[in-house]
Structures are given as C-alpha cells and as structure tokens.
C-alpha cells in the first residue's frame, strides 16, 4: 500500500495488474476484498469494499488474476446476498463485520441429477448435460460458458444425488484432453454471456398485475422498464407490487443504498 484516500487505496504493484481485477488488502488479521478501478504505470488504484480504518502504508495486497465473479449453481433460490454474493443468513449480528465472507451456496447439499447427454455427443458452451430441480425451477447443467471449443462427451454420471462440486460429466477436446464438469461454475459479473444460438426480440406482454401499467404502459417479456420519481413517490412500493404480482417464475430483487 502506497497511499490511502478514504476507501480508495493506491498500491505499488510488483507485476502485471489488469483493470477490474480483484485483490485482497491485508491489515492485521483482516483480509478485505477490493477491485482495481485504474492503473497508471506500476500504481494500481483499488476500491476497497470494506472500511479502511487501521490500514497503513506498507500493508500487503494480493492480486487474484480474475474479475469479480458470481457463483452459478443449484441452491441460489430464496437466498439473501450482499453485493459480493455473501449469504447474509449465515452472518451473525445486525451489521456485516469487516472482512466477512460466507459461501454463496451450501456446497455440502446433494441434488437429484438427471442426465440429458450421453457418451459420444458433441457439445459446446451452454450445451445441456443434465438437469436438477430446485423448488419449482428445473436448472439445466451446462457446459461452462468459458469453454469455447467443440467437445465430445466421454462420460456422464447416472441419475442420482450429487453435490455441486462432484464431477457429473467428462468431455474431451479436439486435442484429446479431458475436462471434468461439475454443477457449479463461476462467471465474471461484468462480462456478458454470449454463448447463445438465438436472441429473440421481445414480442409478448409481461403482465405485472398492476392494471394501470398493463393498460397504459405495458412491459414486454425480455424488455426493460424503469420507474422515475422523487423521494417518497412510491418507486420502491411499486417495485414490490410488481415483484409480488408479476407473471414471472423467478424474481430477483436488488436493493442499493437506502433501499437495502
């Protein structure tokens, strides 16, 4: 650490550092996550996601070599997360302690896996290998989005209960190298998923359950809507009403700042 300006820390790096790279700032026994927001020469400006109280010049910083990532796997539904995908239900107290980290899902839980692919099938990124039912949602277990080539399925486990970290399939690339695939993958939050065959245009109305919206300002499935207004206008209340009544299978509520 070379400089500290509130939660912005200037770090002198002894190697290559990339924009948006994740790093950890150490102060005492506390390890705080941060993100690189600017790089000038060997100086990296990082934004710390925790209080920098007690941090001092000379403290150690470790760079991870990857961007901020989200864990994608069965077990995400009905969870309450902070902005770094820490499970808030696993934390004690009314406030989040500095440096607190919890697993986003229960890695020890078992899920009923049903194979959809067979040995010899040709697959690419996002191809379905199997499925897992979580509550009312049928999750498709896919070839990881980061695998960009065409692969041949070498083996798929039979139907049964498995943990998300267990290998459920093995695929072989063109060079004969095998790749183990589990039910969990990590994806950079700032990188768009592009391994789709088709991106249909919005063509159906999504019923919000609010007659004024459905009549005068209808929203499309796959479309975007927004609610402008001053303080106290009822933006969040309307958002809650849409979340409770809309014709949708999964609702993701994101609260920021005073709404959190």
Identify the function of each model-found stretch.
Residues 4-7, 26-28, 39, 51-52, ...:
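Conserved, well-folded catalytic cores of nucleic-acid-processing
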